[in-house]
Amino acid sequence: MTINIKKTFETVDDGIANMIDAANADYENFNVSDEMKARFKEEWVIKNGSKYTKIMTNNGGTAWGFVVNVDDDKKFKKGTLLKCAGWSAPERNGSRGNVLEGGFPINWTGPLYLVGKGSI
């Protein structure tokens, strides 16, 4: 099941917290034990870098997504959600949403479809 992010936020940190809450709510609908649901909620790791905030699950063992945390990115606005290209870098082919503006779908597995130009 997919959760639609609707709220808007002033800070990237608040937007990320809201998105993680939505991913946790989506995981609640997954057919796993209560123990696994509790562990999933506890194992998020957020790492702020100079250009991106990296979001990880499994106590930092799995890269989940990236959020642009600067105002001067040449392609994306601050708060833009990007999927992972790999462990340490985002895929910069298109936005998956914006944690400050809302209006995008998310599920527990990570950022979904492209939003805007080039979207599906």
List PLM regions with ranges.
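Extended aliphatic helical segments
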Residues: 12, 32, 45, 67-70, ...
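Hydrophobic transmembrane signal anchors and adjacent membrane-proximal interface regions, especially
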Residues: 3-7, 77, 82, 112
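Amphipathic, interaction-prone secondary-structure segments
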Residues: 35-77, 82
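Negatively charged, low-complexity tracts enriched in Asp/Glu with abundant Ser/Thr
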Residues: 2-48
